[in-house]
Amino acid sequence: MKLCGFEAGLDKPFFLIAGPCVIESRDMAFETAGALKEICVELGIPFIYKSSYDKANRSSGKSYRGMGMEKGLEILADVKKQLGVPVLTDVHAIDEIPAVAAAVDVLQTPAFLCRQTDFIHAVAASGRPVNIKKGQFLAPGDMKNVVDKAREANGGADTIMVCERGASFGYNNLVSDMRSLAIMRETGCPVVFDATHSVQLPGGQGTASGGQREFVPVLARAAVAVGIAGLFMESHPDPAKALSDGPNAWPLPKMKALLATLKEIDALVKAHGFMEMAG
C-alpha cells in the first residue's frame, strides 16, 4: 500500500503513527511533531503525526474534548505545511468527513464506530487512506466484514489499514491477543498495532480512563516480533499533565530509545519471513 509517500506492508520496515491524544495547544502540537519527526528521521522510520481535534467518546461529559474542528484542523494543516510531515486525525461523524479529508493526509475511525456501516462507507469514500480501529468488542476475524464494507465504498482501492487496540477483558480492562495481528492480515490490509490504547483501563478512574503505561514497551516489542506494518503510539512530553489519556501515553523523552529497540526487532523478524504465511 502506498501511504504518504512510502510503501506500507509486512515486507517493509514498520511506520509510526504518533503524537498526543488530543491537541492541547498550537505550541505543543509543533513541539511534539517536531521532536517526533527528528527522532524518526534519525532512525529512518516513516512517520505520520497524530492528534485529535475532538475526543467525542470521553468517559465523562466534563472531560476535555479538544480545541474543536475548525481550530484543530487549522493547527494540523499548519503542522503539515510548516514541518513537512503527513498528519492523521480521527473523525467521529459523517458530516465532518469532507472538512477533515481536505485538511489531513489520513483519516482514522474510532474503535467504537467500526460496525457503523454508513460511517465506514463515508470515510472510505473520502479519497483519503483510512486507519480503521478494531472495536474492543470485535473478534479479529470479523474485521474482514468491516474491510469489505470499506471496499464497497472506495471501489476496492488499496487505501485501508486495520488497527488492533486490545479486546475487552471483563470490566475496565483490555487484553492484547497477539494472534489477532496475524488473523487481521487475512483482510489483505496493512496491520497496525496501537501500543498505547492497548494498555488503557477504560473508565478505570471513574470519570476518566486509567492505564498501565509501564506495559507499552512489552506489548510494542511483542507486536513488532509478530510482524506488523505500522505502530501507533500516543506520546506526550509529560503524560501526568496530559489532558486526555495520560495514564497510557508514552513519555516523549523515552520515545527514541524504545523505537530504536523496535526497529532492530522489526528488521530481524522481517529478514526471515513468516512461517505462518507459508501455506
UniProtKB/Swiss-Prot annotation:
Coiled coil regions in record: none
Catalytic activity from the UniProt record: D-arabinose 5-phosphate + phosphoenolpyruvate + H2O = 3-deoxy-alpha-D-manno-2-octulosonate-8-phosphate + phosphate
InterPro entries named in the record: Aldolase_TIM, DAHP1/KDSA, KDO8P_synthase
Pfam families: DAHP_synth_1
UniProt keywords, alphabetically: Cytoplasm, Lipopolysaccharide biosynthesis, Transferase
EC number: 2.5.1.55
Subcellular localization(s) per the UniProt record: Cytoplasm
One cellular component term from this protein's GO annotations in UniProt: cytoplasm
Chief place where the protein resides: cytoplasm
Source organism, top-level taxon: Bacteria
One GO biological process term: keto-3-deoxy-D-manno-octulosonic acid biosynthetic process
Gene Ontology molecular-function annotations: 3-deoxy-8-phosphooctulonate synthase activity
Alphabetized Gene3D superfamilies for the sequence: Aldolase class I
Pathway assigned in UniProt: Carbohydrate biosynthesis; 3-deoxy-D-manno-octulosonate biosynthesis; 3-deoxy-D-manno-octulosonate from D-ribulose 5-phosphate: step 2/3; Bacterial outer membrane biogenesis; lipopolysaccharide biosynthesis
Cytoplasm keyword on record: yes
Family assignment from sequence similarity: Belongs to the KdsA family.
NCBIfam families registered for this protein in UniProt: KDO8P_synth (TIGR01362), PRK05198.1 (NF003543)
The protein, known as: 2-dehydro-3-deoxyphosphooctonate aldolase
Gene that encodes it: kdsA
